[in-house]
Amino acid sequence: MTGLILAAGASSRLGEAKQLLVYQGQSLLERSIRLAFSVCQEVVVCLGAEVKQTVSIIEKLQKEFPSLSYVEIENWEKGMGESLSVGLKTIDSANDVLVLLCDLPFLTNAHMKNIISLANPERAIVASFQGVNSPPVLIPSALRPLFKNWSGDQGLGKFWRLNPMLCEIIHFSDKFRDVDVPEDREYWGI
C-alpha cells in the first residue's frame, strides 16, 4: 500500500502555506508523512506551492523513511484533482493507495489503522467524521482507473457522491476541523 499526500495547494484562504504550519512540534506536512508511514510501505507527496520549503522537510525525513518521495505538480493551481491524477500515475498501478491531506491535525495512527483494516479490493474506504466525509480515503488498485482523467478542482467528494456503491464509509466520532482559514489556526493553537 502506498500513501499519497496531497500538499500542493497555496492555502489562499489561510494566507500562508498550511503544509509548513507547526502543530505539536511538527509541520503539518511532517505529521501527515508520519501518519501515512504508520500503515504504508511507501509514501509520495504531491507538491506545488512552496516547493523549496516542502522539499527540505521531505529530504530531512528521507533519512528516516527511504521510501518517501515527491512529485511536483506542474499545474497545481488547477486544484486537488490535478494533484490526485498526477500523483496516482507515479505509483505502481498494482498498489492500493491511501490518500491523505496535510491539513487534518486531528488524525491519529488509530484512524489510519481502522481505515486499512477495512481494505476491500472492490470498494474505496472513505473516512467520515461526525457525518463529514473526507480523506483519508483508501483506493484499491481496481478502482484507480476511475481517476485517470481526474483534473482541476475535482476532489474526492465527487467520487463518493457519484459512486456510493463503490464506497464503504467508516464512521469516526471525531469532529471534523481542518486548517483552511485563520480561525482554524486559532482553534488548533498553530
Task: Show which residues each predicted segment covers.
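Nucleotide and nucleotide-moiety/phosphate-recognizing core
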Residues: 1-133, 164-172
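Phosphate- and divalent-cation-binding pockets in alpha/beta enzyme and binding domains
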Residues: 13, 53-57, 146, 178, ...
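N-terminal/domain-start segments enriched in small and hydrophobic, helix-friendly residues
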Residues: 15, 30, 144-147, 183-189
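Short, glycine/charged-rich beta-strand-loop motifs at protein surfaces that mediate ligand recognition
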Residues: 102, 143-150
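A residue-level structural signature of the nucleotidyltransferase/glycosyltransferase Rossmann-like core
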Residues: 104, 135-138, 148, 176-177
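Short, well-ordered alpha-helical scaffold segment located
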Residues: 111, 142-143, 175, 184
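Conserved nucleotide-sugar donor-binding
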Residues: 134-145, 182
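Conserved alpha/beta core of the MobA/IspD/sugar-nucleotide pyrophosphorylase nucleotidyltransferase superfamily
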Residues: 149-190
